[in-house]
């Protein structure tokens, strides 16, 4: 592979950093040797109604998977995100909203957000929503989505946020599984200038005979085009809130009371409703936000994630608001109306901290300098990456072009199920290597194990497991604790299995190699798809690549690569040969792709994750059952890939 560059901690960052290298070592040692004391102290980042005396009560033992943190403490999430800031920063901006249309933006102060949340919480109560009831939220990226989530938390209702990109079938499935009482939606969403028919999708979802629990649909007016309207069931947000009191005391919640359910996308069969509870989750979201982004008062922070993704829960809303931060919520996409939109938003709002996904970075990288045209981006101090391993070339481009070669990049590894960051750099404490998630956060004990569960020491490669609990950990899968144990704790007994593979280098840094089901076994050699994809994307003409294995009667598996070229590049037989030789040079002959499939776009979820399950089936010619494609941002991509596959002439 290409030479690994090491980036030192910039002196401008080191000078003011909340955590330095010595402190990282001290805190980390204490956090794993004496978690009771460490987390007992860190839990004070929140305001508790009744302080906890029990900190950690967890078991990863087979048949006894139980995760409880701060279990005798009580608190309210909305009070921690809003009320406690009013005296000192009531007039400070809480949310900067940037519309899909660049001419639309607004700022919401902590005082205003508190008012709107209390008012809407009273509306929910009037509609019969009680503590413990589940409320489905299917909203565009508007401040009212945050209001709805915080209002649920204020009264002790459990929210189940559903991606605005999900189909009616997916919405119905989640409503049925969670037994949601109410749906909160909008007439339409706006994305890249196009309307998204949210209300129509809800109408279609509610036609499913399995949906029996919904009493009302609350509709926020975004575009003024509601379409079908069912009197008695459908209610306008603005009519419900008119004249309603904004006095709503926060419900006292036990630390282990459920806070939200979030369904993980892309798996076949019944959706998995990951359940997070109140206390441990918020301690972890607030603490990871503060230290990983090195957040200082007054910093403008922008996480580009949708609220329907766990990143939107933990790092667009709850982590930042618990810390009294200024958080930017963006309705649009990074390349609309022009490919320099992301850079324009940074300049317009003087963003100091940017957190986005490799898929967005690679899309901008394919446009070259057009992505930064007419912008300075000199307000940026810290940048982050989330969602999948970032290949070193994209990392370096992000670092040099977007960040002007002065901003540390926190490449964060974590999952819906972990609640917050697990392996990540700290800006003032970690030297960076492009493409590495570096070291574990406080209290996180990763290990690499072989396929029979033997822990591997030193520099090695293996299955990434976590050997003990942390406060942000999901407690169960909603209504299915057996499946929770089966999915995460049965492969390697006594350990949480992430489903990812990783390697650890001689400095103890972790490199995520991709999902373990994305590991190829070519002639007995283990190859991570992320490694081959990195090599492909380092080719100057390639924008994006996804690699899967297909059955091969001699090698076991052959390498099938889907490739999107940069703007203006065309596939040719010469390029086909050149790309195969390129990978051969970068990794070795064993990693040479057997098949290159040129395509304009890959099947992705709204959160930007490539759906490899579908790519594997298309590559193998197994098109009989592609499974659930309703979670795709653009389901038409699948038909296009199938057509391309039919017409492919594979050079020998």
Swiss-Prot record:
Binding site for CoA: 191-194, 311, 335, 523, 584
Record PROSITE patterns: AMP_BINDING (PS00455)
Cofactor dependency: Mg(2+)
Maturation and modification: Acetylated. Deacetylation by the SIR2-homolog deacetylase activates the enzyme.
Positions of modified residues (N6-acetyllysine): 609
Keywords for this protein: Acetylation, ATP-binding, Ligase, Magnesium, Metal-binding, Nucleotide-binding
Name of the featured protein: Acetyl-coenzyme A synthetase
Organism from which the protein derives: Serratia proteamaculans (strain 568)
Name of the coding gene: acs
């Amino acid at each position: 592979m290409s030479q690994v560059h090491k980036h030192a901690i910039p002196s401008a960052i080191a000078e003011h950093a909340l955590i330095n290298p010595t402190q990282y070592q001290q805190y980390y040692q204490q956090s794993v040797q004496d978690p009771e004391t460490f987390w007992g102290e860190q839990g004070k980042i929140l305001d508790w109604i009744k302080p906890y005396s029990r900190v950690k009560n967890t078991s990863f033992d087979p048949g006894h998977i139980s995760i409880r943190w701060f279990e005798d403490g009580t608190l309210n999430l909305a009070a921690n995100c809003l009320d406690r800031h009013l005296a000192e920063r009531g007039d400070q901006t809480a949310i900067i909203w940037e519309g899909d249309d660049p001419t639309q933006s607004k700022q919401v102060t902590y005082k205003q957000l508190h008012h709107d949340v209390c008012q809407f919480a009273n509306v929910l109560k009037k509609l019969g929503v009680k503590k413990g009831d589940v409320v489905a939220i299917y909203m565009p990226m508007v401040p009212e989505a945050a209001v709805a989530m915080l209002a649920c938390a204020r009264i002790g209702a459990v929210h189940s946020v559903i991606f605005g990109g999900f189909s009616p079938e997916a919405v119905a499935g989640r409503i049925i599984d969670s037994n949601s009482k109410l749906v909160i939606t909008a007439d339409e969403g706006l994305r890249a200038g196009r309307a998204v028919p949210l209300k129509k999708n809800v109408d279609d979802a509610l036609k499913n005979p399995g949906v029996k629990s919904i009493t009302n649909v609350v509709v926020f007016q975004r575009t003024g085009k509601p379409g079908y309207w069912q009197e008695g069931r459908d209610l306008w947000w603005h009519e419900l809130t008119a004249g309603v009191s904004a006095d709503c005391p926060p419900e006292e919640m036990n630390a282990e009371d459920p806070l939200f359910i979030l369904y993980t996308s892309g798996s076949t069969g019944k959706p998995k409703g990951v359940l997070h509870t109140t206390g441990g989750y918020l301690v972890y979201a607030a603490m990871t936000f503060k230290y990983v982004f090195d957040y200082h008062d007054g910093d403008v922070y922008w996480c580009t994630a949708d609220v329907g993704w766990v990143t939107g829960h933990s790092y667009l809303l709850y982590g930042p608001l618990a810390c009294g931060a200024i958080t930017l919520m963006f309705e649009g996409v990074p390349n609309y109306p022009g490919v320099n939109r992301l850079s324009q938003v940074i300049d317009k709002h003087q963003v100091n901290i940017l957190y986005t996904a490799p898929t967005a970075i690679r899309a901008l990288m394919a446009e070259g300098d057009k992505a930064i045209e007419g912008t300075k981006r000199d307000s940026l101090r810290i940048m982050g990456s989330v969602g999948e391993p970032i290949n070193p070339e994209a990392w370096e481009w992000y670092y040099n072009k977007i960040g002007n070669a002065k901003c540390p990049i926190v490449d964060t590894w974590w999952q819906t199920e972990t609640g917050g960051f697990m392996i990540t750099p700290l800006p003032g404490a970690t030297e960076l290597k492009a493409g590495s998630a570096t070291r574990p956060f406080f209290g996180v004990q990763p290990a690499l194990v072989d396929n029979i569960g033997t822990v591997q020491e030193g520099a090695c490669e293996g299955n990434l497991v976590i050997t003990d609990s942390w406060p942000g950990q999901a407690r169960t899968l909603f209504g299915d604790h057996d499946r929770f144990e089966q999915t995460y704790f049965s492969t390697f007994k006594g350990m949480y299995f992430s489903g990812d593979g990783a390697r650890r280098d001689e400095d103890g840094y972790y490199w995520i190699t991709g999902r373990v089901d994305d590991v190829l076994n070519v002639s007995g050699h283990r190859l991570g798809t992320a490694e081959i994809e990195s090599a492909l994307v380092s080719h100057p003409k390639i924008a994006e690549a996804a690699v899967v294995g297909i059955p091969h009667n001699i090698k076991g598996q052959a390498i099938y690569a889907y490739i999107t070229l940069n703007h203006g590049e065309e596939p040719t037989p010469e390029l086909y040969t050149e790309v195969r030789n390129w990978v051969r040079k970068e990794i070795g002959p064993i990693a040479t792709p057997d098949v290159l499939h040129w395509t304009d776009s890959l099947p992705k979820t709204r959160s930007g994750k490539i759906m490899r399950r579908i790519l594997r089936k298309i590559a193998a010619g197994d098109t009989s059952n592609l499974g659930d494609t309703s979670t795709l941002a653009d389901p038409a991509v699948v038909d296009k890939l199938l057509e391309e596959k039919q017409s492919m002439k594979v050079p020998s």
